[in-house]
Amino acid sequence: MKGVGKPYENSHTSFLLVFFVLTLFSPAFSINTLSSIESLKISNSRTLVSPGNVLELGFFRTPSSSRWYLGMWYKKLSERTYVWVANRDNPLSCSIGTLKISNMNLVLLDHSNKSLWSTNHTRGNERSPVVAELLANGNFVLRDSNKNDRSGFLWQSFDYPTDTLLPEMKLGYDLRTGLNRFLTSWRSSDDPSSGDFSYKLQTRRLPEFYLFKDDFLVHRSGPWNGVGFSGMPEDQKLSYMVYNFTQNSEEVAYTFLMTNNSIYSRLTISSSGYFERLTWTPSSGMWNVFWSSPEDFQCDVYKICGAYSYCDVNTSPVCNCIQRFDPSNVQEWGLRAWSGGCRRRTRLSCSGDGFTRMKKMKLPETTMAIVDRSIGLKECEKRCLSDCNCTAFANADIRNGGTGCVIWTGQLEDIRTYFANGQDLYVRLAPADLV
């Protein structure tokens, strides 16, 4: 028939036209990015994978639960290990969920299009498109699509950790924004909702980390002494890891870096209340616990021995009065009720006082201490002697022979001794007790 082409010719032409249009106008697909016209859905099982194929972001559910979460895990390990969960306390109730970009924010929608989680940021240029990207270090960021560096970040998952600290993540305060980055345990090994334990930085005087069970302080790390935290001597330098603690006008934060990126290591607060360093062992296909804190529930329990006493796992009982101090209540002390602590045999005279040196110690709690990083140990001793309220002193930094000064003017609490590491603490004594 004139003017009518063969059916297969029209079909072939239409197919080529559709293919050309889709190729020309469809967004460029990248395995680690999500554009404003793309989405992640439980139904399509799409995930984002970091460059290097180390970490993967997508939807998951735990074996015993029907609830769904948006989270991140190690991609290539035989043991599924989650390192971040977006909606840990607001899970999807069924297998219908969508992550997309809306109004310059990442939004997680449930089966009724109700928002269960959002980045909820308010800054940015509305005329500039945004993109979500999973970076090589595991940081999931929402950024200006025209800026690939940190200046373009509108939001980042590194600012909102769950129970895990990855290399390059920071634990502590951003003083410019007031943001406090801390870890909170899972409710159980099979439930990612917020659990009982949290690990937070306190920044008064000499910063250190506190482990809380709900609102109760159960352990403290001891202050950073330039090498590590004085109450965590197990966390020593490894050839493939660099530790850093920053304290300046912009931030007070701890981080660690890997010098060998083929090794996977992380810090985690477990559902049972342990802060742990874990490193993956390929030969065994398991996470190896390098150290765990609290190390023991004798000497690592907060203030177990009371004021002016110290804990030593190698003595019986474990609580001991500082040299030239005696139990405040001898009867209770004999019953191993140590919370009353110890008291001086001789009151300080403020003239002719001296010091006893305690080696390999976890420094006392520092929230009321006085810190001066500009002077050394000798000047620190003089300053302590010139203050009748001074009860002890120590170096703030133990590197290069010791620098800086920490002075205590109140009771000395939560002290313990170690077989190795720790640092020197100088406790003030009256002249009669120096013999």
Curated annotation (Swiss-Prot):
The keyword Transport does not apply. PROSITE patterns: BULB_LECTIN, PAN. Gene3D superfamilies: Bulb-type lectin domain (2.90.10.10), Hepatocyte Growth Factor (3.50.4.10). Residues 350-430 form the PAN domain. Residues 33-155 form the Bulb-type lectin domain. InterPro entries: Bulb-type_lectin_dom, Bulb-type_lectin_dom_sf, Pan_app, S_locus_glycoprot_dom, SLSG/EP1. Pfam families: B_lectin, PAN_2, S_locus_glycop. Keywords: Disulfide bond, Glycoprotein, Self-incompatibility, Signal. It comes from the Eukaryota. Residues 1-30 form the signal peptide. Disulfide bonds join 380-405, 388-390. GO terms for biological process: rejection of self pollen. Stigma. The keyword Nucleotide-binding does not apply. Glycans are attached at residues 113, 120, 244, 260, 389. Involved in sporophytic self-incompatibility system (the inability of flowering plants to achieve self-fertilization). This is S-locus-specific glycoprotein BS29-2.
